[in-house]
From Swiss-Prot:
This is Cysteine--tRNA ligase. It is found in: Cytoplasm. A motif ('HIGH' region) lies at residues 32-42. Its cofactor is Zn(2+). It comes from Geobacillus thermodenitrificans (strain NG80-2). The keyword Endoplasmic reticulum does not apply. Belongs to the class-I aminoacyl-tRNA synthetase family. A motif ('KMSKS' region) lies at residues 267-271.
Amino acid sequence: MSSIRLYNTLTRKKETFEPLEPNKVKMYVCGPTVYNYIHIGNARAAIVFDTIRRYLEFRGYDVTYVSNFTDVDDKLIRAARELGESVPAIAERFIEAYFEDIEALGCKKADIHPRVTENIETIIEFIQALIDKGYAYEVDGDVYYRTRKFDGYGKLSHQSIDELQAGARIEVGEKKDDPLDFALWKAAKEGEISWDSPWGKGRPGWHIECSAMARKYLGDTIDIHAGGQDLTFPHHENEIAQSEALTGKPFAKYWLHNGYLNINNEKMSKSLGNFVLVHDIIRQIDPQVLRFFMLSVHYRHPINYSEELLESARRGLERLRTAYGNLQHRLGASTNLTDNDGEWLSRLADIRASFIREMDDDFNTANGIAVLFELAKQANLYLQEKTTSENVIHAFLREFEQLMDVLGLTLKQEELLDEEIEALIRQRNEARKNRDFALADRIRDELKAKNIILEDTPQGTRWKRGS
């Protein structure tokens, strides 16, 4: 039996993870609508579920990871009209930008990245099957899902039909039978991109796309379906209704949702002018700092984005990289074996066990990072020993590399620009002036790990790059 426990939105409790097939995991993550660059809220979902995939692979599971692109949609059509470009041209540009952004953030590509426009036939067949079973109906070229016919509607978002009915409205121009019904196929409007179908020219509704593509690439029932908390209702609720009405089987065994991201304690929105695009931020900071920041809070909890918290994340990542760099520098000056190798190797085994225990508990990356800080602390303690062993140093390095890789974090030391070095020296001088010697020493160690040598003189601090 697996020791991994995860929180299932469907049941609102932590459950032991038992995939449908032993050692195989089928995972579907809702991807972006590609009409613009992704924002840092999208980035949180990408980073969180990439990390969960990495951890499952680390624990020996064979993961098939599917994440879609919505490459036709109202937003894309509007963007095409505003920019005077075609929908496919805009989609292609932002799919390319998406791959650049997530690669910078340390996310691996999905095994399959299906696009809606490449799966129109599959979607049409799915809709026709729902019509044949009485779960959908056509009105003047539009096709709607008959929501009340599906008994389990509301089970994911834990809402009753009566509660949902109270807030439902029929928009002007809609001809559906019930305010709760939603569109599976939208009849074409003049000048819009469209495809031929049994109901005339049109395009798919948003919700049906994921149901059809998840089934095509992963089968009737998948292990994990994941996405942002904002997708729970109506998107994921509607996916369940569509898929389970068609197959009569559970659509997904486990539903995972990451929490919201706020900016300086306010919801991120274009109207507030606090909308942060990944494309912009990764040109200002090390993208790995953004990833570290996202993983420093449990994935289900809300996270607050601010300059101060980003700086704290930068310091945290630097602390780990510095400890790793110090170990590397000691390699040539160590002996083959020492008397206390066994004790240190035992400590390392305990650290790995702690990391696994924390990550097994609903992928708690925040506590996983705390374990990495303990690893850094033990590394620094070890380097204070009179004699060190290459055997133990290599074991420390391996733990750093493997556990950091699970979190998608790199240990590569970026070469500092001259201005960055000068800024750190000014920060160190300020710390010394304020008698914060711990901070001053930490900055000096950070620079030393990046091969920057400081010399304090009566005229001020000088620096040079080591050979």
